[in-house]
Every structure is written in structure tokens, then in C-alpha cells.
């Protein structure tokens, strides 16, 4: 089995074939199995478009995308690709379909015809992993935003994906909700070995990743560990992004004449 789970090779994509502007313009990236990758960029940079290619929601205009070696353009592999890569979107209300939490988590498994005993085990395990087991008999609409998002995550995890794509999954949450969701995601990555690709605007979330990709105008323009990327504070700011508070504080101390190690 290859160490690489996701690959994009010279990926190009336009939403309107009659327009010259590409949402993705020659993007080549790889994500290793078990890795936590954060993707940053200003609005319109192409990061969500890239995320949707990894789940075959969108298909390349040119170039290739592979999921565990499967070509996303191969219709016969579509089911396997979406079993391998689960997605969690910005608004949890768009992913919740049932009126009881545990029924929502079980929804996709029921559609797949998973045997009842296995379904019960998967649903319970997924709710416990996501930290929502105590809410299993509650109505989703009575939960907080962070709790709803963890219900959505549990529903995806119940499918046993190898990779989880978060498309700005914390964008609509308050700080407490973001913290709850990220604790769940880190648990799934570190303890369950699930590969995570997180599309985010939050620098503090990106600082906790194994690797950071920064996109601008359809290109990957920076790549490296959080330390390597965020130590280039001026370049990050030139891309209309903030830097983590730790890097910002270091810059201020250096300006004040206090010697500091790199971020």
C-alpha cells in the first residue's frame, strides 16, 4: 500500500469554460497517509475547489487526481473514492437529515444496507469518537453549532473513511465550538490514523497541522511545516492572511530589539 493517499498532478479547473480564469491552475500536491494538512488562502484562492476534487465532487478540466491510486475521472471508482474520502462542510445543517442524532449518524449506513448489528456498533463507536454519545437521543436542532458539526463528523466517520476533508468546517462556529470540533479531529487523526485535510481561515488551527499549504489565485504558493511557513510572516501577510499570535508576538519582540529564535 502506497504512503500517498491523495495526489493532484498539474490539476486545472474552471467553473466557466468560456472564461480565461482558472480556479485551479496547474496544482500539484500529495498528501501522505495519516498526515494532517491545513490549506490556507484568501477567499477565491481555490482551496475549496481543490477539496472538492479530492472527493470527486468536481473533476479536472485537465491533469489528474488520484485517491489511493484511483483516478477520480473513472466513474467505476466513484463509489470506492467516496468511501475512502469523507467530507464535512461549513454548515452542519446541510449535512444533517434525521430528527434524532443516532438516526442521522446511521443514515448513510442504512442506505448501504449495512447489517443491523454492525451498524449499531459503528454508530455507537463513531458517536463516542466524536464526543456526542450522550446526545444520541437528542434532536439535532436543539444542539449547539459545535455539537451539530460533531454529529456531521460522526456520520462521516461511521462510513470508515481513510481520509477526512474539512471544507471550512469550523467557519460558522464560536470559539468553544471550534475547539470542540478540532479536539475531535485531532483525536481521529492521532488515535485512529485518519488522514485529515483541513481547509481553514484560522491560523491557530493551521499551526497545529503537520504541514501547511498556502494557495493564491489557483496556485500553491507556499508549502512546509507550520514553523517553516509562519516564520515568513511578511510573505504570509502579503497573501492577505494573518499569522498565528505566537509568530506575531515574535515579530514584535524582534522589532523591539529582543533576540528570539525562529517561530
Cite the ranges covered by each PLM segment.
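The feature captures the beta-strand-to-loop junction immediately N-terminal to the Walker
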Residues: 40-42
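Helix-to-loop junction immediately C-terminal to a conserved catalytic motif
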Residues: 55
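Conserved ABC transporter NBD signature motif
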Residues: 63-73, 81
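Conserved ABC ATPase "signature" region
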Residues: 117-135
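Conserved ABC ATPase signature
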Residues: 139-143, 147
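Catalytic Walker B motif of ABC-type/P-loop ATPase nucleotide-binding domains
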Residues: 164-167
Amino acid at each position: 500500500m502506497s504512503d500517498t493517499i491523495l495526489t493532484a498532478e498539474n490539476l486545472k479547473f474552471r467553473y466557466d469554460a468560456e472564461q480565461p480564469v482558472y480556479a485551479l491552475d496547474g496544482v500539484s500536491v500529495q498528501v501522505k497517509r495519516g498526515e494532517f494538512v491545513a490549506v490556507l488562502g484568501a477567499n477565491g484562492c481555490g482551496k475549496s475547489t481543490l477539496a472538492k476534487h479530492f472527493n470527486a465532487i468536481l473533476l479536472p478540466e485537465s491533469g489528474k487526481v488520484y485517491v489511493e491510486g484511483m483516478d477520480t475521472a473513472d466513474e467505476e471508482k466513484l463509489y470506492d473514492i467516496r468511501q475512502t474520502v469523507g467530507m464535512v462542510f461549513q454548515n452542519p445543517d446541510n449535512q444533517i437529515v434525521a430528527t434524532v442524532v443516532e438516526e442521522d449518524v446511521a443514515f448513510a449506513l442504512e442506505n448501504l444496507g449495512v447489517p443491523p448489528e454492525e451498524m449499531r456498533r459503528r454508530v455507537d463507536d463513531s458517536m463516542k469518537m466524536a464526543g456526542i454519545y450522550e446526545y444520541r437521543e437528542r434532536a439535532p436542532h436543539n444542539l449547539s453549532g459545535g455539537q451539530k458539526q460533531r454529529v456531521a463528523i460522526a456520520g462521516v466517520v461511521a462510513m470508515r473513511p481513510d481520509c477526512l476533508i474539512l471544507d471550512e468546517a469550523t467557519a460558522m462556529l464560536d470559539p468553544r465550538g471550534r475547539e470542540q470540533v478540532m479536539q475531535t479531529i485531532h483525536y481521529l487523526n492521532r488515535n485512529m490514523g485518519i488522514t485529515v485535510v483541513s481547509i481553514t481561515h484560522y491560523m491557530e488551527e493551521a499551526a497545529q497541522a503537520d504541514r501547511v499549504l498556502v494557495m493564491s489565485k489557483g496556485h500553491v504558493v507556499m508549502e512546509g511545516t507550520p514553523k517553516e511557513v509562519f516564520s515568513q510572516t511578511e510573505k504570509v501577510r502579503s497573501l492577505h492572511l494573518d499569522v498565528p499570535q505566537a509568530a506575531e508576538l515574535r515579530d514584535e519582540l524582534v522589532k523591539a530589539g529582543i533576540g528570539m529564535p525562529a517561530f
